Amino acid sequence: MSAIADITAREILDSRGNPTVEVDVILDSGAMGRAAVPSGASTGAHEAVELRDGEPARFGGKGVQRAVEAVEGEIFDAIGGMDASEQVAIDETMIDLDGTPNKARLGANAILGVSLAVAKAAADEIGLPLYRYLGGVYARTLPVPMMNIINGGKHADNPIDIQEFMIQPVGAASIAEAVRMGSEVFQALKKILHDAGHNTNVGDEGGFAPGLKSAEEALGFMTRAVEAAGYRAGEDIAFALDCAATEFYKDGRYHLEGEGKVLDAGGMTDYIAALAKSFPIISVEDPLSEDDWEGWAHFTSTLGGAMQVVGDDLFVTNPTRLRRGIAAKSANSILIKVNQIGTLSETLEAVELAQRAGMTAVISHRSGETEDATIADIAVATNAGQIKTGSLARSDRVAKYNQLIRIEAELDIAGRFAGRTILRG
């Protein structure tokens, strides 16, 4: 395997028009890997820390020139000449160099950009697609998408408290068919919303952001769209929610301001249970606050037999927090976001840890994305079975679906679509 010969970084824009880091790693053979780093809007308090410049006169303080300098300076000095195939050693070298528990000194955005680009360069060196390089001969499962078609919360400017309302085409036979089904429902929903007098502007992740007043109303529109597209809700297409409950958790209570409700953890459990009785909800993410461990355990013991309970802000792709959650039976699934932990090797460790504990893993985008489709390869490499990467609009979201379609075509008969195997209960 070739050694790392050069690393260059640059400041580019993400899908929200904010700066982010892009990194090129060049090996002495000429092989190259390029990676662009995503960024979140609703971020957990325990996530790895992005390094921003903090200069108000430039990008409103959000510039990433300091992270770029860290990549081309300290990080290159530390890992230049290392074997690109030694992913764990390279990642650990960067972690040690940073010296903080949350990668705050050099920036998780700097470290992650290098980590992903190193893996891509190593794959390029031996002529393998990234999913095959990372996952080996067993990388073959095409994930069921979670497609965000209605946005609320921090992802939209409307009264809906819940952040994401998603569809999962569990009845599809392939990823290509799943994408088609999702697109047809998305277009049907657009017409139904328009005919009902709602705007059809889209939010950060490509879903519609209509001025609806409640989760029940949003789920009702989704059901109508599924049926209008010629499918059966609950049979062909199931629903998933991302509550992002930390965003409306204050003083020990959950404030659903759009619906005029103030609930405790038990009340939130009952609230979701009631929605699940009326609609085919098979997965709910972050139904409680990121540090409400007791509430999470109660929620999962109550509803986890029938639905997937996904920890995002709870776990922040961190193996240490995940181990605590496994011991406490806080959730039965983890959302995997590469920039929450900041290196590829730690990301893969979290997936493996969850799977060994009998949990599912959902590979996820962030609200601030780029055309980089690395997470599609990671989803297949880990046989995760599920991917969350936004709506059927905006090229930064569609790029991941298109990459999955390419991978499916390349795998041919060796590939399998996860489909109904993700269902619980």
From Swiss-Prot:
| Cellular localization per UniProt | Cytoplasm; Secreted; Cell surface
Q: Kindly state a single biological-process term from the GO annotations of this entry.
A: glycolytic process
Entry's transmembrane regions: none
The reaction(s) annotated as catalysed by this protein in its Swiss-Prot or TrEMBL entry are: (2R)-2-phosphoglycerate = phosphoenolpyruvate + H2O
Q: Where does Mg(2+) bind?
A: D242, E285, D312
Pathway(s) the chain acts in = Carbohydrate degradation; glycolysis; pyruvate from D-glyceraldehyde 3-phosphate: step 4/5
| Cofactor comment | Binds a second Mg(2+) ion via substrate during catalysis.
Q: What is its EC number?
A: 4.2.1.11
- Could you name the active-site residues? E205 (proton donor), K337 (proton acceptor)
GO terms (molecular function) for this protein are: magnesium ion binding; phosphopyruvate hydratase activity
- Record-linked PANTHER family: ENOLASE
Annotated NCBIfam families: eno
Q: What does this protein do?
A: Catalyzes the reversible conversion of 2-phosphoglycerate (2-PG) into phosphoenolpyruvate (PEP). It is essential for the degradation of carbohydrates via glycolysis.
So what family is this one in?
Belongs to the enolase family.
Question: What name does UniProt use for this protein?
Answer: Enolase
Native organism: Acidiphilium cryptum (strain JF-5)
Question: What is the gene name?
Answer: eno
